[in-house]
Amino acid sequence: MKGTFPIDKFQEIQTPFYYYDTNVLRQTLKVINQEAGKHEGFEVHYAVKANANPKVLNIICQAGLGADCVSGGEIQAAINAGFPANKIVYAGVGKSDWEINLGLDKGIFCFNVESIPELEIINELAEKKNKIAQVCFRINPDVGAHTHANITTGLAENKFGIAMRDMESVIEEASKMKNIKFLGLHFHIGSQILDMGDFEALCNRINELQDQLEAHHIEVKNINVGGGLGIDYNHPNRMPIPDFKDYFDTYAKKLKLRDGQKLHFELGRAVVGQMGSLITKTLYIKQGTAKQFAIVDAGMTDLIRPALYQAYHKIENISSDEPVETYDVVGPICESSDVFAKAIDLNKTHRGDLIALRSAGAYGEIMASQYNCRQLPKGYITEDF
């Protein structure tokens, strides 16, 4: 089953471009709010790194989500889109001074701090501005997620977070700093996680840490468990909205929250992944010795995930209903890795046919580059047509 697209309108647009189905986005946001709203103290932040298209950000902001940012640029993008500063959290292992100052000036909710040297700099910069910086400490729980090695973030070998053994000393250090206010703990174990057992393992680790801190009379008002919930890349039409009920229920059942504690989530891919498709045009059908190639005008510069992560995206010829043939779908970039898929079945494809690479709403447009001096792809939402 193919997706539904305004194909006639697409003929007028220069390819390649991203198309964002805002009906899917709004329905996804509705389900998120419904399911998270069933649990007291659950607060959801959108991970801006997944897709920072201004029109997309504005819709997400209007739905009431907060923003999870990993750079000064993302903080500014969130502010520009209307996200309240007191609902913005800022993470990242390498925060520059200007980015920290921006967060302080805007009055963001908190900095997710990843090391003592970073904490010292935040305190120093806050002191110069006579401000109090609210912080959560990102703890590396050494929990492995069943996902691609490049997108695991919670193992001891990863660069992210503070080791569990150092947690108490870091909190003690923060208590001595006059311009730091400790708010809680932050975790994030990875991305594109579909096994709820991974989130259960995180809950168990957090429960252990909370008991440990409680024994030392350390109060934790906020727990941020990051995001990581994946999407179904194989069946974008059958499963356009992830199982948010199971996701939020897992934390509600397995995590032992204290009275009055807030539980924060940072969801990106699960919010925007299925609403987006990369639309590209077929340039040539090339007969090789043992295969045929569908050469399209989009490349790894427009969607790098297949080359970077060997990621799968369902590919559809949305112009043709002819019987299927087998193709390698490749782009124009001067790299052998510029391949979207090998030996896939598409309806018989001709020059000029429009091809849709589905489930491209997350880590697509935002990761595009101008390698080979190519233009960046534009992003359009349903309302643009």
What are the functions of these language-model segments?
Residues L57, N80, I100-D105, I122-L125, ...:
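Short acidic, glycine/serine/threonine-rich loops at helix termini
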Residues M1-A133, S175-K181, D211, A215-I218, ...:
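A charged N-terminal "starter" segment
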Residues A52-K55, Q76-A77, G144-A145, G190-D195, ...:
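Flexible loop/turn segments at secondary-structure boundaries
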Residues A47, Q134-N140, H186-H188, N224-G226, ...:
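Short beta-strand segments
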Residues D142-Y284, L346, N372:
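Active-site loop/helix belt of alpha/beta enzymes
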